[in-house]
Amino acid sequence: MTDIHWSDDARVVVARAKMEPLRARPYSLGELFSSDINVKNQRTLFAYVPGSGEQAAGRKDRGFATVVGIVDHEPGKVLVDFIAWPESIGDETLTSSVYKVDAGSGNRQEIEQTKQTASFSFDGRGRARLRTTTDGNDNPVLMYRPGAGEQWL
């Protein structure tokens, strides 16, 4: 496990990780899980969990998830950046989505989405205020949102 985040006083969110020779520390595999401090009530937040036989699939998240923030005024909620994997050969569109996730229940609400790979910066209320993407020449493009729900400038 790596990337440990406290979502509230009694619950942590962790990323499944892998350790390889000659690497200084484990690296995230893009799957997120939560647990209370007693290691009970564990939840899969983001991962690809296929079904088998009669069992339905638990989660079918085809992509890479990272915790990018904690929502200060809503204990137990984290902000997760999810970059979807391409759907087919030649598909270079990597959709970026940001979710507000309840670490206890696993419920999620999409709060941002862009059809290109992007990173976001958030204010104290968990609202995306800065968005960084790249143009056709791989130059960074920084966009600003003056207030909640307003257009990107």
Residue ranges of model-derived segments:
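Beta-propeller folds
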Residues: 1-153
